[in-house]
Amino acid sequence: IKFDGLSRVSHVTDATDWRVEFPLVVLTPDSEAEMAALVKGCIELGLTIIPRGGGTGYTGGAIPLDWQSAVINTEKLIDIGRVEPRRLPGLDRDVPTIWTEAGVVTQRVADAAEDAGLVFAVDPTSAEASCIGGNIAMNAGGKKAVLWGTALDNLASWRMVTPNAEWLEVTRINHNLGKIHDAEVASFELVY
C-alpha cells in the first residue's frame, strides 16, 4: 500500500500522457489471493478502483479522474502456465490454452505459444511491456487480429473480483474458436 509521491506520480498517466489527477493510493498486491480484500477495502472507503498493468494503453483506461481513486497495479501477478490442450465447454475436441495472471507481459505468452509451435493471436506493438490483463480489458489486437481475432475473441475464461469482493469465474460456452462477432450468440457460464 503506497501513499508516497513517487508511486502516485508514476501512476497518474498511461501511454497517452493525459494527466487529470493523482490517485490517493497505489496498491501492489503480491498475489492474486490479496485482490478480493483490496477491492473490498477500496469499496468500503468509496474509492474508484483503477486496475493497471504495464501502463501502455492509449485509451486512458488507467488514468485517475479524481483524487479519490486507488490504482491496483497488477505487475507482480506474473504466474504463467504452459500451453496445454484443454476441452472447452461445448466443444468436442481439445484446443491449446494457456493460463496466466493479469500482470504477465504479453511477450511471455507469445514466446510460450511459439515454443509450443503455435501463434499467440494478440500482438500489440507494446507486447514487450503490456500485460495480459490490460490486453483483455482493452480488447487488444495487433496485426494478427485480422486473421485470428482480438483478445476477447481468443479468451476462454477469466476470473475477476466483483464489487461485492467475491471471486467470479466467467467461462465462454460453445466457443467458436474465431472472432466473437462471427458467432450468432456468445454464451458464458458464471460461477461464484
Regions found by a protein language model. Name each.
Residues 79-90, 96-192:
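FAD-binding subdomain of flavoenzyme oxidoreductases
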Residues 50-51, 121:
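Short hydrophobic alpha-helical runs that function as membrane-insertion/retention elements
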Residues 52-56:
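Glycine-rich beta-strand-to-loop/alpha-helix junction loops that act as flexible
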